[in-house]
């Protein structure tokens, strides 16, 4: 069983949870006509970044798929960011049952506003870690954690498993 065989009701529940009061317009992504052009506004989410569109629904697709596939471990999201992804992912996963999120960012590689957004994100299951280095260093660190078999085994034994909110997760495209 996969999420792609989800019922209309399951997908509807994911959509309703994702695109609720966190968006400031009932249309979520309104199509606006200006002159002879049309624009799809993707900035109405809680972080005002287009990434809110995918990262608001990803936690609900992920937890629905996990439940359908009998996954009982808590899912620990590890994500590297150079800015927008971190805050949008943290906002999407904040207080979603069965998940935790840890965002790694270059301490001197994001804007002061982005850093403050991440550091002040509410949620009992959210954490953010500033690293010395650049985005590539943060991403390499996350990849190294994913590839550490011993760590994965220990975490699995404690009831946890890793996933990501970066674009390597197919859920970002769904």
Regions found by a protein language model. Name each.
Residues 104-174:
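Small/polar-residue-rich loop-to-helix segments that shape phosphate-bearing ligand pockets
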Residues 77-116, 121:
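Glycine/threonine-rich beta-strand-loop-alpha-helix active-site module
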Residues 25, 46, 99-101, 133, ...:
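Conserved internal helical-beta-strand scaffold that buttresses enzyme catalytic cores
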Residues 38-92:
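Well-ordered mid-protein domain cores that form the structural environment of catalytic cofactors
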Residues 7, 45-50, 54, 77, ...:
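Catalytic cores of large soluble enzymes that bind and process phosphate-bearing ligands
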Residues 2-3:
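Short, small-residue-biased leader/transition segments that mark boundaries at the very start
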Residues 6-43:
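Anion-binding (especially nucleotide phosphate/pyrophosphate-binding) glycine-rich loop
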């Amino acid at each position: 069983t996969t999420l792609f065989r989800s019922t209309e009701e399951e997908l509807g529940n994911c959509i309703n949870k994702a695109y609720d009061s966190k968006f400031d317009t009932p249309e979520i992504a309104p199509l606006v006509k200006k002159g002879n052009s049309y624009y799809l506004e993707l900035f109405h989410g809680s972080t005002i970044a287009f990434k809110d569109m995918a990262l608001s629904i990803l936690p609900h697709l992920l937890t629905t798929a996990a439940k359908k596939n009998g996954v009982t471990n808590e899912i620990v999201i590890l994500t590297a960011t150079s800015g927008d992804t971190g805050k949008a992912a943290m906002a999407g996963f904040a207080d979603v049952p069965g998940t935790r999120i840890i965002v790694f960012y270059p301490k001197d590689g994001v804007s002061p506003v982005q850093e403050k957004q991440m550091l002040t994100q509410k949620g009992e299951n959210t954490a953010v870690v500033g690293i010395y280095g650049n985005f590539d260093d943060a991403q390499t660190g996350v990849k190294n954690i994913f590839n550490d078999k011993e760590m994965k085994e220990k975490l699995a034994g404690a009831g946890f498993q890793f996933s990501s909110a970066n674009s390597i997760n197919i859920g970002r495209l769904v």
